[in-house]
Regions:
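Amphipathic alpha-helical assembly/interaction segments
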Residues: 1-166
């Protein structure tokens, strides 16, 4: 019986250390990002936006000013919301803005489908941009899941009375 209690205690201590080690790793991983420009999803959103602009300068888009504005605005909105959410300094707000960025990513996909349907895009252009949007949306969702699973509340609450107890 005594051996069982010692084993149970050892197992609990080992599990506690593993959990603590994981939390420290997550904190280190999250703490290494100092500004939104370092975020991979921001960089991917920026690349997508940079690809949308030259595509919408093509002859096929010339007379559809409103559509051009919409797709450019939506693609820029992805990166803008990632930046704004990150700069707010709290995870709850960052999550809200990530969901908005994910919604804008869906909006760009919808607009790409429409552009393809009316013949504005070549199949290769459409497939490349559409797949890039899908991947970006998945990356945003993965970051959302990581933040939700994390105990970190964000820089806004560091050394604050609102920070959760250690």
């Amino acid at each position: 019986m005594k051996q069982f209690k010692e084993f149970k205690k050892f197992k609990e201590v080992k599990e506690f250390k593993e959990v603590k080690k994981f939390k420290e790793f997550k904190e280190f991983k999250m703490a290494t990002v100092k500004n939104f420009e370092e975020l991979a999803i921001f960089q991917k959103a920026r690349e997508l936006s940079k690809k949308i602009y030259p595509i919408t300068r093509k002859e096929e888009f010339k007379l559809d000013y409103r559509f051009v504005q919409q797709i450019r605005s939506a693609s820029g909105s992805i990166m803008d919301n990632i930046a704004e959410g990150f700069e707010r300094g709290g995870n709850k707000e960052f999550l809200n803005f990530l969901y908005i960025a994910k919604g804008s990513c869906g909006e760009v996909r919808s607009q790409l489908i429409r552009a393809n349907d009316v013949g504005y895009l070549k199949p290769q252009e459409y497939n490349e941009l559409y797949n890039e949007c899908r991947k970006l949306s998945a990356c945003i969702m993965n970051l959302i899941k990581d933040i939700k699973a994390s105990d970190i509340t964000g820089i806004k609450y560091k050394d604050s009375e609102f920070a959760p107890p250690p």
